[in-house]
Amino acid sequence: MKLSELFNPNEFAARHLSFGDEAALLAAVGEKSMDEFVGNTLPQSIRMPSELDLPEALTEADALAKLKGIASKNVINKSYIGLGYYPTRVPNVILRNVLENPGWYTAYTPYQAEIAQGRLEALLNFQQVCIDLTGFPVAGASLLDEATAAAEAMAMAHRVGKVKSERFFVDARVYPQTLDVMKTRAKYFGFELVVSDFAQADEGEYFGALFQYVGKDGDVQDLQDVIGRLKAKGTIVAVAADIMSLVLLKSPAELGADIALGNTQRFGVPMGFGGPHAAYFAFKDEFKRSAPGRIIGVSKDASGKPALRMALSTREQHIRREKATSNICTAQALLANLAGMYAVYHGPKGVKRIANRIHTLASVFADALVSDGLKVVHEVFFDTVTVDFGSKEKADQVFAAALESGYNLRSVNNTQVAAAFHETSVYEDLADLYRAFTGKDTFTFADDVKGRLNAELLRQDDILQHPVYNSYHTEHEMLRYLKKLEDRDLAMNRSMISLGSCTMKLNATAEMLPITWTEFSDIHPYAPEAQTAGYRELLADMENSLKAITGFDAISFQPNSGAQGEYSGMLAIRRYQEAQGEAHRNICLIPKSAHGTNPATAAMLGLKVVVVDTDEHGNVNIDDLKAKAEQHRDALSAIMITYPSTHGVYEEGIRDICRIIHENGGQVYMDGANLNAQIGIMQPAEVGADVLHMNLHKTFCIPHGGGGPGMGPIGLKAHLAPFAPGHTLTDTHSASAGQTSVAAAAFGSASILPITWMYLTMMGKQGMEQATRWALLNANYVAKRLSEDYPILYTGKNGRIAHECIVDLRPLKAESGITETDIAKRLMDYGFHAPTVSFPVAGTLMIEPTESESKAELDRFIAALKSIRREVQKVIDGEWPKDDNPLVNAPHTAADITGEWAHPYSREEAVFPLPFVREHKFWPFVNRVDDVYGDRNLVCSCPPMENYED
């Protein structure tokens, strides 16, 4: 035996893929080898001519060791920078049982509410925190970050406001990263931003205004008067408020504002070099149908019991397309759950103690500096002490002294330095900082301290009074509450989730481990560059890998969601065309089958959408495309196209599509939603795309988190690279330096990038291509087996599909009256999450099994759908009534089968329809949720405790 054969660097690929199933799967689809299968599936014209230029795979242990070495190059100083990011303590019970728990992080966005009641309750808890602290009656389930939330507030103010103006006022005290993102958005909306002193806000006519509360340099201003004067003119007022300060300060609603927004990172979410974090967004009730993002609402189920769901979805891009309130198609659900549970665990007394401790430490520090003769700039502050030293030399000296002692401060300007206190600040920090600021070693203070907040600024109302914030303060109680909610949700630790266009693949444990390493989690996004060498190396590694995979010349990691990636890619095209003197190019061609984010994104950039027809095979109609491209050639900006198509096939004409667009002066944006069917076998840049966004939360193993976080970096050809997002506070060392940004942090949600790095490193060049091949094979196996019972709507070359297939339920629906929704809900009784329902074609299911499912799991899923087909036949044959059968009554709960039973089918048929279901039964917590009732009677706050008890 050779020793070398006992070491297997490709061991991870064998865990990610089921190599032992290859022969059986190939035989089922009528192929002799994997090469033959891929050759008969992928058009030869787009086949990648050479293998991937990636390193060889490393084992899990070796990859973790290598990444640990990279992480160790980051320097963890004590961060007193502030600007919206602060060290915090993640309660360990929440860290282990939510953030590190696949029952929470592998779930999908809760479209199927009946099997998502746990995280829906957690998100409702988050909304209630935001409602309590802001004073508004409605809050969303989170947005991407504070800066984009501010931009959304600006857009919403324009939608709902009545002032006939295109001018928007911005308080000069807003965070610089927020202003930068607002500049990006405002330009293409045609808004003029006026940045000035907050007290001058009422001196002009504005459709909206944004104030910072607490200001970027720490001051707390009483905004009530100026807001009142603006409101008298009809201006819509938004307040960006520090979430921790609102524990003590008057709410934005009490100040008279219309909208409140901010970052909830301080509520137990690590800084993570910029993210991910959950932004909050709260507002007046009359604006609810114009708000961006997800809103969780209380409804009822078919038995009349309270049930939760995502509400008012008709606002969103997947329905309203270019008329949507935003292109947002996700939230930061996992991070919102962390922040909400932080409030649940600490309760009102706990969060008040933390907020008071932060403020008191800052006050003690300020008092000591004043006693020593230093000039504290702001008399009234919450957590940030800004000192003016009168000279650059002295300010630099203090900054350097703090740095040498292991503290990062913020240089406000040439003469001013700020220190932002936070939850993890301790006595020793006071002494160290005092020494840095004064040069003196002796630091004393009285235990009884007078704060720096005026009485008229302080909150008088109670917060967090709902029982959920007053019941789980011991670890045992909290542990059991989290477990109770987890058990109400179906995530990928229970069964496959075959959502088409979503790529719900394995999120391996080894990939997830590094995200909680302090070397990654405890870095401020604006830390000195010398302290972030590890992150910079990680980013460089990933940039090289993604360039090799896609064929592009440059990568931008700033977009912190897929929709943000779309926006950034199209933004680069717009900026490039403007630089070429072609700002008039404003026509965007979009195929009829496109995801709703595409037209919504185009509209946000001031583009006019022209829809391109598809043919009977689901492909872009080349003749229609050519005609419309030529018709609009003088104004053509771009085409937005998904590949493989949203219909799940490799379009033979993709090169022709790109050529036609280029010949008519346009650029090609490729939506990377289906990149999982490309890696190692084709390159988007090589077939003609100019820019592509990549969903790292799909193709590259970042989990969906129950509705976020995501990452949507973009790949660009060289001519577009200078027009990618830049950043006002961080040197990205890229060609796009000087451009305004699309997200608050330069590298988006950087702390989840190690997940993708681990995936790339453990798979290596062979594993990455194998993953694509297996994604195709699994999908074609499912399609072949299901085609015996259901029509497969679209196929490509040789009757093959790509990585997903569309099952057409319309003929069955017409014959039986059983709907696609009935079948989706019935799958829950079999222990499965439904595939994508009615997208991209109404009355269908789109199935994407991914490469990481075994044949055994695929067979269980197939058996479930075949069994459901037999159940539908019983309805057709009259054996079961159309209005009383397991499909229309699905899903069935434990309460159903233990109560009275008058149905024409048995209890066993209801809940144990196949033998395998008995072995691993998942019980939906509620019956079918009433969507109409929930929208007509919107309640987005926590219901009374008796509802939980019932």
Curated annotation (Swiss-Prot):
GO biological process per UniProt: glycine decarboxylation via glycine cleavage system
Residues with PTM N6-(pyridoxal phosphate)lysine: 698
Keyword Oxidoreductase assigned: yes
Keyword ATP-binding: no
Protein's recorded name: Glycine dehydrogenase (decarboxylating)
Functional description taken from the UniProt entry: The glycine cleavage system catalyzes the degradation of glycine. The P protein binds the alpha-amino group of glycine through its pyridoxal phosphate cofactor; CO(2) is released and the remaining methylamine moiety is then transferred to the lipoamide cofactor of the H protein.
Enzyme Commission number, as recorded: 1.4.4.2
Keywords for the protein's UniProt record, in alphabetical order: Oxidoreductase, Pyridoxal phosphate
InterPro entries in alphabetical order: GcvP, GDC-P_C, GDC-P_N, GDC_P, PyrdxlP-dep_Trfase, PyrdxlP-dep_Trfase_major, PyrdxlP-dep_Trfase_small
Record note on quaternary structure: The glycine cleavage system is composed of four proteins: P, T, L and H.
Similarity comment text for this entry: Belongs to the GcvP family.
A GO CC annotation given for this chain: glycine cleavage complex
GO molecular function: glycine binding; glycine dehydrogenase (decarboxylating) activity; pyridoxal phosphate binding
Reactions the enzyme catalyzes: N(6)-[(R)-lipoyl]-L-lysyl-[glycine-cleavage complex H protein] + glycine + H(+) = N(6)-[(R)-S(8)-aminomethyldihydrolipoyl]-L-lysyl-[glycine-cleavage complex H protein] + CO2
Transmembrane annotation, as ranges: none
NCBIfam families membership: gcvP (TIGR00461), PRK04366.1 (NF003346)
Required cofactor names: pyridoxal 5'-phosphate
